[in-house]
Amino acid sequence: MKTIIALSYIFCLVLGQDFPGNDNSTATLCLGHHAVPNGTLVKTITNDQIEVTNATELVQSSSTGKICNNPHRILDGINCTLIDALLGDPHCDGFQNETWDLFVERSKAFSNCYPYDVPDYASLRSLVASSGTLEFINEGFTWTGVTQNGGSNACKRGPDSGFFSRLNWLYKSGSAYPVLNVTMPNNDNFDKLYIWGVHHPSTDQEQTNLYVQASGRVTVSTKRSQQTIIPNIGSRPWVRGLSSRISIYWTIVKPGDILVINSNGNLIAPRGYFKMRTGKSSIMRSDAPIGTCISECITPNGSIPNDKPFQNVNKITYGACPKYVKQNTLKLATGMRNVPEKQTRGIFGAIAGFIENGWEGMIDGWYGFRHQNSEGTGQAADLKSTQAAIDQINGKLNRVIEKTNEKFHQIEKEFSEVEGRIQDLEKYVEDTKIDLWSYNAELLVALENQHTIDLTDSEMNKLFEKTRRQLRENAEDMGNGCFKIYHKCDNACIGSIRNGTYDHDVYRDEALNNRFQIKGVELKSGYKDWILWISFAISCFLLCVVLLGFIMWACQKGNIRCNICI
C-alpha cells in the first residue's frame, strides 16, 4: 500500500511540473533583462544601497600631480613671490612686463632686497594677480632738491648696491630735503596702479642723516582718496643686516583723476605705473611641477580632469572645474537594477523571466526574450526598448556636469591678523557653502539614480505589456515573467512576437483547443497540496494499523507481556 501511495505522489508531482517545450503543441516565452554577477551599489532616495548593473563615478579624487600649461598660460614664480616681482627685487628682474592666466607661487620663494612689509598685502596681491600682467610704464616724475636712486648693500644688483627697480629711494641733497609736491594726471582710458613706500629708519640719527628733518611725512592723494603716513622710527629685528624697514602702499588712479604726492622726507617714490587690466587671472600657491599637457582645471595638487561634476582634491581651483564636495565617492547609475541570475532552476532546468531574476550574458541589449519550443531554446535582445532606455540615460552625466561645473576660479582667501574676525566669518561661510554643495550633490545623484532605476523598470514593464497584448488569450501569464503559449510556435512564430508582427487570430482556434485539453489533465498547485495531505494522512493511518496489529499478534504469542500496576 505504501509503495502505491509513494508512486501516486511522484506521479502527481510529475504531472504538476511544467515542461517548457516538452509538448510540440505548446511553447514557453520569457522576457528578461540584463544582469551581471557582481553589480555596483548606488544610493537612491528610497534606498541607501541598491545594486545596479553599471554605474559611473562622479567624484574626481586624484590629480595628475602636475600643472598643465595648456590652455591656461602659467607663469612659474620659481624663487619670487608676486609682490617681489611687482616691486622689482633684483633676483626677480626676469618677470618684468610678464603676463599670465595663473601665477604659481612656490614655497621656496624668498625676498632678497631691502626688508619691507605691505600693510594690505593680501589685497595688493589679489589685485595684481587678477590683472594678469606686470606691464610697467615709466613716467617723468620731477623730484627737485633731493638725491634719487638710493641703494643698499642688502639689495645688491650684481656686485653693486641696488634697490627695487620699480621704486625710487629719495634722500637729502647736501644738507637739505625740501618739501616735495608732485602731480601726475591720468589722461588715459585705463586704471593706473602706483606703488610707493615710506622708509622707517631704525634710529633718530639715521633719520636726520637721510632726511634732515627729525620726523618726515608722506601724503598721497587722488580725487577719491588720501593716505598720510608718518614714519615710525625704531629698531626692529635684523634682516639682511638691517633693522630699518620700508612699508609699501599702493594707489589706483582712474581715468581723468590726478595723483598728488606731498612729502618732507622718508618717501620711496614711484617710477611709473602698472597698467591695470580686467580679467579672470589669478594666483595659486603650489609646489606641483608644470608639465606639457592640457587641462581646464588646476588645483594646488596639480591639474585634474573636468569630465566629472564633483571633486574632492582641493577647495582651491582655477578654470572650469568640478564642484568641490566632501564625499570621496558618488556613483551615478548608468544601468538597470541588478538581479543576478540563479544558476540552477530545478531538476528540469525551466527558464524564468524578469520577475524572478535577470539574465547574465546578454551582450546585444538590456532587454530580451528567451524561448523553449519544439525546435529547442533561444535568446534574442529587444533593441527598441534597449535603445529607449539608453537614450534617456546617456545624457544624464553631461546634464549633471553642466549643472555643477564652475566656470570661474575659487581663489585663496588671505587676511591680515587684524582681520581675524573677518577671516573666521569667511571660513564659516565657505565651510557652510561646501556642506550645502555636498548635501545637494548627494541629493542630486540619489534623485537621478532613482529616476534611472524607475525608468529601466518601466521599459521592462512596457515590453511585457506589449507582449501580453499581442498574445491575448493564446497564452497564459505564468507569473514569473514568462508566457505559456498554447499553440505550436516555431522560431518564426517566436520572431514575429519579438518584432511585433504576431497575428493572434491565426493561432486562436489551436490555442483554445489545446488550452482545454491541457487544463483537463493539468493539476494545479492547490490540488497537489490536497493530494499531499491526503497521502500523508493515509500513510500515517496505515502505519498505525500495522503497528497495532503487530503488538496484538506478539501478545497472543507470548512474545510481549504487559503488566499493569496500581
Curated annotation (Swiss-Prot):
Protein name: Hemagglutinin
Subcellular location: Virion membrane; Host apical cell membrane
Transmembrane annotation, as ranges: 531-551
Extracellular side: 17-530
Family matches, as SUPFAM superfamilies: Influenza hemagglutinin (stalk), Viral protein domain
Domain of life: Viruses
Miscellaneous comment in the UniProt entry for this protein: Major glycoprotein, comprises over 80% of the envelope proteins present in virus particle. The extent of infection into host organism is determined by HA. Influenza viruses bud from the apical surface of polarized epithelial cells (e.g. bronchial epithelial cells) into lumen of lungs and are therefore usually pneumotropic. The reason is that HA is cleaved by tryptase clara which is restricted to lungs. However, HAs of H5 and H7 pantropic avian viruses subtypes can be cleaved by furin and subtilisin-type enzymes, allowing the virus to grow in other organs than lungs.
Gene3D superfamilies: 3.90.20.10, 3.90.209.20
InterPro entries reported in the protein's UniProt record: Capsid_hemagglutn, Hemagglutn_HA1_a/b_dom_sf, Hemagglutn_influenz_A, Hemagglutn_influenz_A/B
Sites carrying sugar chains: 24, 38, 54, 79, 97, 181, 301, 499
Species name: Influenza A virus (strain A/Port Chalmers/1/1973 H3N2)
One GO term describing the cellular component: virion membrane
Keyword annotations: Clathrin- and caveolin-independent endocytosis of virus by host, Clathrin-mediated endocytosis of virus by host, Disulfide bond, Fusion of virus membrane with host endosomal membrane, Fusion of virus membrane with host membrane, Glycoprotein, Hemagglutinin, Host cell membrane, Host membrane, Host-virus interaction, Lipoprotein, Membrane, Palmitate, Signal, Transmembrane, Transmembrane helix, Viral attachment to host cell, Viral envelope protein, Viral penetration into host cytoplasm, Virion, Virus endocytosis by host, Virus entry into host cell
GO molecular function (one): host cell surface receptor binding
Disulfide bonding pattern of the chain: 30-482, 68-293, 80-92, 113-155, 297-321, 489-493
Known partners and oligomeric status: Homotrimer of disulfide-linked HA1-HA2.
Segments on the Cytoplasmic face: 552-566
Post-translational modification: Palmitoylated. In natural infection, inactive HA is matured into HA1 and HA2 outside the cell by one or more trypsin-like, arginine-specific endoprotease secreted by the bronchial epithelial cells. One identified protease that may be involved in this process is secreted in lungs by club cells.
Function field: Binds to sialic acid-containing receptors on the cell surface, bringing about the attachment of the virus particle to the cell. This attachment induces virion internalization either through clathrin-dependent endocytosis or through clathrin- and caveolin-independent pathway. Plays a major role in the determination of host range restriction and virulence. Class I viral fusion protein. Responsible for penetration of the virus into the cell cytoplasm by mediating the fusion of the membrane of the endocytosed virus particle with the endosomal membrane.
